[in-house]
Design a protein with these regions (language model features):
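Nucleotide-sugar donor-binding catalytic core of glycosyltransferases
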Residues: 1-26, 31-48, 54-214
């Protein structure tokens, strides 16, 4: 199995998939971020190179986030050998294009036991793109806790900060759809930290969740 992504935001997804399919010696490929590639490339480039092309969508496709659904992406979704998604809300949208779309939940992959304990000098760690919704929570939390907002795609830097943190906090970017950010939190599973997420419409990973108003008192 081969793996391709369009952005470092998919790094943890790719690592999870590599672990899951480590014994798969096929010439198939799983593509994350096809909505990006499809703006400038034809899927034919990949279909010629690989035996099977699997498009793994992870972008929210509810009514308020249709910017990801453009003609090029429609073509990719129609022509891919398989289409996967990790959220049932997206599945219902994708069924309009691909009735055979498959639900694929990410699986924990990281062995945190190999890391030596360090001093927990960070109360709350957050990383991810910022918007008004996320800033509002983080600014309030800063009044009571030592909050670190990390801006890095370097896995070693991220792991170092995770080990130093008491709480790993996930806040929805697209809070209207409240889809669980598996692509971020899958790295956290098994870490020596308390994981807290803003409440999702469905808790696939079984993490601790709180309503928006409750996040201010973690």
């Amino acid at each position: 199995m081969n793996f391709i992504s369009s952005h470092p935001a998919f790094n943890d997804t790719i690592d999870s998939l590599k672990n899951e399919f480590k014994d798969d010696k096929s010439n198939n490929v799983i593509i994350c971020g096809a909505h990006d590639f499809s703006r400038t490339q034809s899927i034919d480039l990949y279909k010629k190179k690989y035996d099977k092309v699997i498009v793994f969508n992870q972008e929210p496709l509810t009514a308020t986030q249709r910017q990801f659904m453009h003609k090029g992406y429609f073509d990719w979704l129609k022509q891919a050998d398989e289409v996967w998604d990790y959220d049932k809300q997206n599945i219902e949208v994708l069924k309009l294009i691909r009735p055979d779309v498959k639900l694929h939940i990410l699986k924990p992959y990281k062995d945190w036991s190999k890391y030596s304990p360090v001093e927990k000098d960070i109360d709350i760690l957050f990383y991810g793109a910022l918007n008004e919704h996320r800033r509002a929570v983080l600014e309030e939390l800063k009044k009571k806790y030592k909050v670190v907002i990390l801006n890095s795609w370097d896995g070693n830097v991220i792991d170092n900060h995770i080990m130093r943190s008491k709480i790993l906090l996930n806040i929805h970017y697209y809070y209207e759809s409240s889809m669980q950010e598996q692509a971020r939190m899958i790295r956290w599973i098994g870490s020596p930290c308390r994981i807290i997420s803003e409440k999702s419409w469905k808790n696939y990973l079984g993490v601790e969740e709180k309503e928006y108003s409750e996040l201010l008192n973690v």
